[in-house]
Amino acid sequence: MEKYLSVTTLTKYLKMKFDKDPYLERVYLTGQVSNFRKRPTHQYFSLKDDHAVIQATIWSGIYQKLGFDLEEGMKINVIGRVQVYEPSGSYSIIIEKAEPDGVGALAIQFEQLKKKLTEEGLFQERFKQALPQFSKRIGVVTSRSGAVIRDIITTVSRRFPGVDILLYPTKVQGEGAAEEIARNIARANQRDDLDLLIIGRGGGSIEDLWAFNEEIVVRAIFESRLPVISSVGHETDVTLADFVADRRAATPTAAAELATPVTKLDVLAHLQNQEKRMVTAVRNVLSKKQEALKKCSQSVIFRQPERLYDGYLQRLDQLQLRLKQSLRTRISDNKQLVQARTHQLVQLSPVTKIQRYQDRLGQLDKLLGSQMALVYDAKVAEVKRLSEALLMLDTSRIVARGYAIVKKEESVVDSVESLKKKDQVTLLMRDGQVELEVKDVKTKEI
């Protein structure tokens, strides 16, 4: 009788075969990416050719180190291991390494990052800064030992001696180079005495120049407050740093020339030219002034200067005469005015008015005293009357005269209408009180 296997048993057997097969532990596979949708962590997709499809998985740690992004339809070469997934009975390849087929991964990464940064606008011309005409101090981010810094120092010293060069020794290739380049660009921007920044290195392979294609370097250049000149590799080499920099130079020497657009000889020639122009201008002015002075010295005014102020002397005499007449008239008018005001003041003397007001004040004082005495006597009589009335209302005085006061619940009873049968009342008398109960209520007929 045949023995039947369970699906689980068969699947486990196949998985064991897959796991132990040396040919499936490390598989070199080429195929086209299909059904790819980028996920935040692990990537799941298919690899296919014209006749077959296999499921593929890249764990997040591996994917982040690829250096390029997978795209739908991209043909890639991968290295991985084949495994069976028991719950579905399917098999797939777990990719450990991948690179684009035919084109290097760095070239793919270059184009992908270039596209991304272009869409963000980092390469737009409107963000480019103008280079200064005259720089007092230039920062250079490059290797300490390379020919780049020597060429820059030589060229700047030749073109404009006295310009300071501040070197930021930097690792320009290999692991950690991009971070160091970006860090030194940021350091240079923290100084207030730098006018310009040159970044660069000598020629090399795309791998050697790759640090200048890293996103961290591109963004550091874009965010630089200082204008940046890039000089990376040879003239045929192009990096993303060249796209984002304010100017690109094919060589370090060309970069130094861009950093010093005006040479010391240019300045000296300009100063000499300006000196000549100033001398010519001064001579022309002197010549014109001398000619004008000559004409003035020959004029009637210079030959007979008294004619210049004869008319003014006559005018001065007339003004002095008019001033004297005006002062006499003004003094006479003011004297008459003072006399008139003095007479008015005598007529309006306040002595009489003051005496009259004093007499009136004495009369009012006497009248006020008599009126206050009358009011006081009236108020005293009123107080006495009210005091006597209050004494009449004093309950102790009422009961002392032999009367009694009836109270119900602390209220004085002044009418039988406020009482009813069996009410409890208190009778206040001269020497005490009595608690009583109402037996009957009779109303007095009026």
Swiss-Prot record:
Full protein name: Exodeoxyribonuclease 7 large subunit
Localization: Cytoplasm
GO molecular function: exodeoxyribonuclease VII activity; nucleic acid binding
Main enzyme class: hydrolase
UniProt entry keywords in alphabetical sequence: Cytoplasm, Exonuclease, Hydrolase, Nuclease
Broad class of where this protein is predominantly found: cytoplasm
Subunit field text: Heterooligomer composed of large and small subunits.
Family label: Belongs to the XseA family.
GO cellular component, one term: cytoplasm
Enzyme Commission number(s) of this protein: 3.1.11.6
Task of the protein: Bidirectionally degrades single-stranded DNA into large acid-insoluble oligonucleotides, which are then degraded further into small acid-soluble oligonucleotides.
